[in-house]
Each structure stands twice: as structure tokens, then as C-alpha cells.
């Protein structure tokens, strides 16, 4: 299992680099990301969250029973949005911002192009929860956290909670 870095780690604010080598090392890394995401009860994980600032992420939305089957796993490398439409409010959390959840406004429908673990190009259209998860993880690749999208009042609430937790852990 890979260690997850948490806010305010400076790597989380860095733009990730494109993947150019689609080799066995990358595939093994993606497998380790999947194991880590499941162990931490996540639905998505960007490579930068485990300390590797490359443009790679995984998303696995649970089914109705809460299962995250391997065949439903999306491995998204070098993503580029083609279109974004609509608006949705979604209560988000993040493995790199533990124990904090807040409503974030996102696009409701997205279309993007990406490469898979072998470098093959694909296109996907997503809406609702999947669209939100993809935007959240792609934001990580651009050095953006969901807390960066909060209103000033909600951001201050987060900073206050963070300071409180930091004092409690001393």
C-alpha cells in the first residue's frame, strides 16, 4: 500500500507532469494505487496524492451494493476535457484532506479524452457522481484541491477545523 500525502503538503499544489512512458513500472504503480484507494475507502485517487506528480488517476464508483469491482475501474492518464456542461452540487471529501466534507459546485456532464495504461487513447462521457469524481481527481493533477473551490466563509471554516485538529494532535 502507498502512503497518502495530506494537506498542506506542497506537492498537492504542484501541476503534475504528463506520462510519456507506458511501461510495466507504470502498470504496477496503477495497481498499487488501486489497492491503496480501496484500503482507504476512496472512490478516486490521483498519482500526486501518493507522492508521484504524474498525470494519472483512478476512479471506481461503487455500485448499488457499495462494491467496487475491478472491471469498473477507470485508469485515466493524461486527461483532457473536451466539454463540460450543466451544474451540480456535490458533498465532497478527499483522502488528502481527511475528515472534512463540504458541498462543491461542479459541472454535471463532462466529456474527456485520455490514455489507458498501455497508452491507447479513449474518450468518455460522464454525468453525476462519475463526472464529479473525474473533475475532483483531474483538479489534483492541476494542483487544485476541493477546498480551493469553497467560498471564503467555508474555507475559513476548514482552516479553523484544521488548526483545531492540529492542536489536538500535539
Swiss-Prot record:
Catalyses: N-terminal N-formyl-L-methionyl-[peptide] + H2O = N-terminal L-methionyl-[peptide] + formate
EC supergroup of this enzyme:
hydrolase
Q: Name one GO molecular function term.
A: metal ion binding
One GO BP: translation
Active site positions = 137
Q: Which InterPro entries does this UniProt record tie to the protein?
A: Peptide_deformylase, Peptide_deformylase_sf
Q: Where does Fe cation bind?
A: 94, 136, 140
The UniProt note on the cofactor reads as follows:
Binds 1 Fe(2+) ion.
EC no. given is 3.5.1.88
Which cofactor is essential here?
A: Fe(2+)
- Tell me yes or no: is RNA-binding among this UniProt entry's keywords: no
Q: What Pfam families does UniProt report for this protein, alphabetically? A: Pep_deformylase (PF01327)
Q: Which domain of life is it from?
A: Bacteria
| Entry's family note | Belongs to the polypeptide deformylase family.
Q: What is this protein called?
A: Peptide deformylase
Species: Wolinella succinogenes (strain ATCC 29543 / DSM 1740 / CCUG 13145 / JCM 31913 / LMG 7466 / NCTC 11488 / FDC 602W)
Amino acid at each position: 500500500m502507498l502512503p497518502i500525502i495530506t494537506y498542506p503538503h506542497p506537492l498537492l499544489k504542484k501541476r503534475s507532469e504528463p506520462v510519456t512512458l507506458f511501461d510495466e513500472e507504470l502498470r504496477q504503480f496503477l495497481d498499487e494505487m488501486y489497492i491503496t484507494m480501496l484500503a482507504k475507502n476512496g472512490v478516486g485517487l490521483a498519482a500526486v496524492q501518493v507522492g508521484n506528480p504524474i498525470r494519472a488517476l483512478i476512479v471506481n464508483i461503487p455500485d448499488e451494493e457499495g462494491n467496487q469491482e475491478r472491471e469498473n475501474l477507470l485508469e485515466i492518464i493524461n486527461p483532457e476535457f473536451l466539454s463540460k456542461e450543466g451544474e451540480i452540487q456535490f458533498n465532497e471529501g478527499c483522502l488528502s484532506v481527511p475528515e472534512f466534507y463540504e458541498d462543491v459546485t461542479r459541472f454535471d456532464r463532462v466529456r474527456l479524452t485520455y490514455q489507458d495504461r498501455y497508452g491507447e487513447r479513449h474518450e468518455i462521457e460522464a454525468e453525476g457522481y462519475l463526472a464529479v469524481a473525474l473533475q475532483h481527481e483531474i483538479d489534483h493533477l492541476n494542483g487544485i484541491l476541493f477546498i480551493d473551490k469553497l467560498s471564503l466563509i467555508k474555507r475559513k471554516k476548514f482552516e479553523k477545523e484544521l488548526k483545531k485538529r492540529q492542536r489536538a494532535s500535539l
